[in-house]
């Protein structure tokens, strides 16, 4: 068991504890809230996006929720794959 915060999870503490246990890679498939918290804490080292050729309506949220982030040095496209019109993009920080 990892305790990483009193009430809310301190993501930096949690990831540090995982690293101490030998888990150097963590895949976070969270929603906008978790993604926003990771980005705000500077804990993202890769961003994978999928673009679909299908249109859907509704009230979809952005991929990051929370306060606005200051633009940093940006991200660079690391790889791009296409299959059946879907684009799979992998970005890494500059």
Predicted segment positions?
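Enzymes that bind and transform nitrogen-containing heteroaromatic metabolites
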Residues: 1-94
